[in-house]
């Protein structure tokens, strides 16, 4: 097992890999700020063996500078700050419409989210463990207040319970709805005719949102499930774009447009400004970034 290294030792390791460090003191300041391990993700595309993830030597292509990885890091940082606001908008709208539509469809059953006639059994089986008995739910004041007022209720009604579920649980709830017409109706509200296609859209948005929420690298994002593009709306995704950052942002823009065209316009404008600024400041890194992310500069 590797042992912890001082910042000076970290500098030595980076230099041994061929990374040019013109200002060691500034590099130390950055390593203390960002962290050696975190910054390592941004050196990866400069490695000779990239995109290979096994048997890596960590040696970089000649001419790679410390500032190159830092520039990618701050591009990611700025992109994350832009995306967070719009991802939240989509999450709230998705949660709201799913709750609204399903609660009206099953008016006589305020606990439709655990009803075997509405959702598949595996979701119901896991609901207590994953959702209702989670620490967040046990400490939630609104949920506690409901049960204090109605002690006989096993669960709070959908409009309370679903409001406090995690985005991941909401996505799983959508996929667990048994009636295909219900799923299709929710998908259509966001401009997608097929529920299977929409499930991949919302999966991509969820993955992107999680990366942003946890401060993880975005530029080389890979979607675990991919996006179904061929049978969905014409959004211009083919090949690798169905699994990369460009694909995730494309479906985010598409879904956001069906929530608010103005907000979609705002997001596109902010992205264009970020891309233009990056091109002006670090034009030599544009091709590397495009190769990793699929973004269209």
Where are these regions (language model features)?
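Acidic/aromatic/glycine-rich contiguous surface patches that form carbohydrate-binding/processing clefts
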Residues: 215
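Extended intrinsically disordered or low-complexity regions, especially N/C-terminal cytosolic tails and loops
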Residues: 1-208, 219-297
């Amino acid at each position: 097992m590797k042992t912890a290294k001082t910042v000076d030792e970290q500098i030595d390791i980076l230099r041994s890999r061929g990374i040019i460090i013109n200002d060691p003191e500034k590099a130390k300041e950055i390593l203390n700020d960002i962290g050696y391990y975190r910054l390592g993700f941004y050196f990866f595309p400069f490695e000779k063996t990239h995109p290979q993830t096994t048997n890596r030597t960590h040696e970089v292509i000649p001419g790679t500078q410390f500032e190159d990885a830092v520039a990618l890091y701050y591009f990611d940082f700025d992109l994350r700050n832009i995306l967070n606001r719009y991802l939240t908008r989509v999450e709230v709208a998705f949660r709201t419409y799913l709750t609204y539509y399903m609660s009206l469809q099953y008016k006589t059953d305020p606990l439709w989210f655990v009803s075997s006639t509405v959702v598949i059994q595996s979701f119901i089986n896991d609901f207590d463990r994953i959702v209702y008995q989670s620490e967040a739910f046990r400490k939630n004041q609104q949920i506690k207040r409901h049960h204090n007022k109605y002690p006989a209720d096993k669960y709070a009604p959908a409009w309370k319970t679903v409001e406090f579920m995690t985005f991941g649980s909401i996505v799983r709830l959508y996929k667990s709805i048994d009636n295909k017409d219900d799923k299709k109706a929710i998908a259509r509200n966001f401009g997608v005719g097929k529920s299977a296609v929409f499930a991949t859209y919302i999966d991509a948005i969820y993955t992107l949102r999680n990366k942003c929420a946890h401060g993880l690298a975005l530029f080389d994002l890979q979607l675990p499930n991919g996006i179904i593009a061929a049978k969905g709306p014409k959004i211009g995704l083919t090949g690798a774009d169905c699994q990369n950052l460009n694909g995730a942002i494309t479906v985010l823009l598409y879904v956001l447009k069906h929530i608010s065209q103005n907000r979609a316009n705002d997001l596109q404008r902010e992205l264009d400004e970020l891309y233009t600024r990056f091109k002006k400041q670090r034009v030599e890194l544009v091709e590397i970034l495009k190769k990793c992310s699929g973004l269209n500069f």
